[in-house]
């Protein structure tokens, strides 16, 4: 059975659906026409593979705009901030130039927005704030995601599906499984191997075909 979209946490399991390539194309196309905060939230989740709670726990001083990485060291729910449960969840996640450009633009946007309200943006401020300048809630992120999926005509996928999509596409592109595991903050590589076993089986089949082609071309 498919998971329904709710504001609750989802277990990292094979039941979490990822986007197909066509669905992702539609989703990103819709996202490009949204406001800058919406773009930042969902492109960060998609391109970093971080958990929703990790995004909610990010502060500006956790983002290195020179070296292009997120320093993930906390997680946040609707009732406060906590340290990650495992040591491997504390990690650096590097991001690309296009996300860097978007984040810089968003930072200027936030500086101007807060300045109009007589507030100076601090490095200790949360990366994502609500319109009332409070930490964004899980339910708000989920609601925004539902609207985007409806516009993109994508069904039966959760916010956690963005993390699953990130990992799936990396593995399909041939990324080292150990690197993917570290990037996701998994406790050990066996978790990654178990969760993405179906994707890895397809990679194994392609590897077998590749060996056949290599021998034929000797």
Feature annotation, model-predicted:
Residues 1-58, 66, 90, 98, ...:
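Basic, Lys/Arg- and aromatic-enriched nucleic-acid-binding interface segment
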Residues 4, 26-30, 81-84, 198-218:
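DNA/chromatin major-groove-contacting recognition/catalytic segments
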Residues 7, 48, 57-112:
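Conserved tyrosine-mediated DNA breakage-rejoining catalytic core shared by Y-recombinases
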Residues 18, 76, 184-210:
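Catalytic-site neighborhood detector that most strongly recognizes the C-terminal catalytic loop/helix
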Residues 43, 47-54, 139-140, 144-152, ...:
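C-terminal catalytic core of tyrosine-transesterase DNA break-rejoin enzymes
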Residues 62-67, 156, 175-195:
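Short, polar N-cap/turn motifs at the start of nucleic acid-interacting alpha helices
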Residues 83-105, 122-145:
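C-terminal catalytic core of Y-nucleophile DNA break-rejoin enzymes
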Residues 110-124:
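Short helix/loop segment immediately N-terminal to the Walker
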């Amino acid at each position: 059975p498919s998971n329904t979209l709710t504001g609750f946490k989802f277990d990292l399991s094979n039941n979490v659906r990822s986007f197909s390539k066509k669905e992702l194309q539609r989703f990103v196309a819709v996202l490009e026409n949204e406001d800058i905060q919406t773009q930042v939230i969902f492109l960060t989740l998609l391109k970093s593979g971080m958990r929703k709670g990790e995004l909610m726990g990010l502060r500006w001083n956790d983002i290195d705009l020179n070296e292009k990485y997120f320093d993930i060291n906390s997680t946040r729910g609707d009732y406060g901030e906590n340290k990650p449960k495992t040591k491997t969840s504390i990690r650096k996640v590097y991001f690309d130039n296009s996300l860097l450009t978007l984040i810089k633009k968003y930072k200027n946007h936030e500086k101007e927005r807060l300045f109009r309200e007589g507030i100076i943006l601090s490095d200790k401020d949360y990366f994502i704030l609500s319109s009332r300048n409070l930490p964004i809630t899980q339910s708000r992120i989920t609601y925004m995601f539902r609207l985007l999926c409806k516009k993109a005509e994508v069904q039966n996928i959760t916010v956690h599906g963005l993390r699953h999509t990130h990992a799936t596409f990396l593995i399909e592109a041939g990324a080292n499984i150990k690197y993917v595991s570290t990037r996701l903050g998994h406790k050990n590589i066996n978790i990654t191997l178990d969760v993405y076993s179906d994707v890895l089986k397809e990679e194994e089949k392609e590897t077998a075909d590749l060996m056949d082609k290599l021998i034929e071309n000797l």
